[in-house]
Amino acid sequence: MLCLPVFIILLLLASPAAPKSLETRIQNDLIRAGLTDADLKTEKGFLSGLLNVADSVCCKVDTSCCSN
């Protein structure tokens, strides 16, 4: 009778350690890839926005730096 609680505890400890299914791993990879793509797109948009602001400030101060 003492073996039953030990067996149950071992089952509880072993179940979270079970490997993830392939489908779950693929979903995690796709989510991570999507976040990476989103970061890159945001960064490019952010950098181009900064360049536009810097260009407009430069044009207001000195017209020789304007690209137009």
UniProtKB/Swiss-Prot annotation:
Recorded GO cellular component terms are: extracellular region
Q: In which tissues is it expressed?
A: Expressed by the venom duct.
UniProt subcellular location:
Secreted
The principal localisation class reads: secreted
Instruction: Select a single GO molecular function from the record's annotations and give it.
Output: toxin activity
| Matches recorded under InterPro entries | T-conotoxin
Propeptide part(s) removed at maturation, as residue ranges: 20-54
Source organism superkingdom: Eukaryota
Tell me its family: Belongs to the conotoxin T superfamily.
Query: What is the name of this protein?
Result: Conotoxin Lt5.11
Origin organism of this chain?
Answer: Conus litteratus (Lettered cone)
